[in-house]
Amino acid sequence: MARMAESKLVAAAPRPGRVAGSFRDPSGQVFHFQDRILRTMDSAAAIEFASAERVMRQLVVEGRLVDFSDAEPSLHQLFQGSIARVLQHPLLEQITYPYEWSFAGLKAAALFHLQLQLDLLDQGFCLSDATAYNVQFEGSRPTFIDHLSIKPYRDGQLWYGHKQFCEQFLVPLLLRSVFDITHHSWYRGNLEGVPSADFVKLLSTRHWFSHKLFMHIILPAKLQSSRTSQTKVDLGDSRARRLPKDAFRAMLAQLYSWISGLKVDVGKQSVWQGYAANNTYTATQRSEKGQYVAEFVAQHKPRTIIDLGCNTGDFSYVALENGAEKAIGFDFDPHALDAAFDRSVQTSKNFLPLYLDARNPSPSQGWGERERQGFSSRFSADAVLALAFEHHLAIAHNVPLAEVVAWVTQVAPKGIIEFVPKEDETVRRMLAGREDIFSDYNEEAFASALSQKARVVRKHLIPGSKRTLYTFERSE
């Protein structure tokens, strides 16, 4: 009777909604249903999955693969067609994309992917593709989410994911390491990474003498160009070509060693890289600000925090040390984000720093304008910190102050916003050499804009400065 009742409840429930980005593999798709993720498989996929299940279970234990279990039989009736097996997974709190990761984060994901490939190969399995979107982060720890891309290894098979790995991991990393160009805008514009053919055009003659660059990027790009420019090219049957297992392993190991050694020029001072040391705050004022954040977290007890303009994460750590369980930081400075990511790795805190240009947040895009969801669809928290943030939009980029306030208050139902007046040295620097057109930029206008969107529950003037911290609770 209990099973019949459960079956009726399931039948009456809303149909599962396919995750918009899950459409490329017809053998299995991913659905969002209530508070979980469901993954369907056809019979062929179910057989392959069963063969790898023991290996996958060990990866779950190691924290390298999202957990899975068989969905209750009653859930099968929610799907049409020949579904052989349905898995359920815990719902990830946050989905992030490679064009939001820092250089350090993308590098960690690349090394994670390669190590996973190497370990699977030792056990007779491999990954069927190399998309970076199959990696997600819990704090700074990468984890794998696509169970059906773990396949039995066939002796001598080619690595069909090589081009994808290079364009979604290697080339974006080289773009920064070689040319000090960040990957974010290029990657987001293309979605599938940075094309090798485009990267090759940036290389000088001396780069052609690099064996690794030539073998992994230059030669494949030239061969691809040759194939597309000729109407008929006899390349032979790819099924007849073989890549011995030892050669496959050596290729993966070479890439791992190469990427491990990639670095950025930390000697190039970026706009906010030295902010923590060179801002207009005194140590006492900074401590006062941290104490205010600590008191806010202790009183309101937010489980999750979004830190806008996080820099290297100081105030995210204050929140985590005072009761918050998870913090996601956003900044547009690449050096600060790399330092923040490395700090998260070293401390093992649940803190993930991500790239965000708040003037132009990640949009919903891709197939049907839904394949990759936008910032506002994916990121929300119990509380938001917007410390030394609003003036960068309102003054540096001419975004109306009221709109800045409205945007920040939509990120979380409560939080702290710091107002930085024109008299502050930082704003004075921003206005130096340009006309001051911001007649309505003042604390009265800020407070009025905030009161239209939320209730101000506390305000605090930082001693020795003209900056004011506002605690708000959004009006629902």
List each language-model region with its residue ranges:
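Catalytic activation segment of kinase domains across protein kinase-like and atypical kinase folds
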Residues: 126, 131-177
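Conserved class I S-adenosyl-L-methionine
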Residues: 302-311
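Conserved SAM-binding loop of SAM-dependent methyltransferases across substrates and taxa
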Residues: 312-324
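Conserved SAM-binding motif I beta-strand of class I
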Residues: 326-331
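S-adenosyl-L-methionine
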Residues: 341-378
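A conserved beta-strand element that flanks and buttresses the S-adenosyl-L-methionine
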Residues: 384-385
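A short, conserved alpha-helix within the catalytic core of class I
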Residues: 392-408
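Conserved beta-strand signature within the Rossmann-like core of class I S-adenosyl-L-methionine
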Residues: 407, 411-421
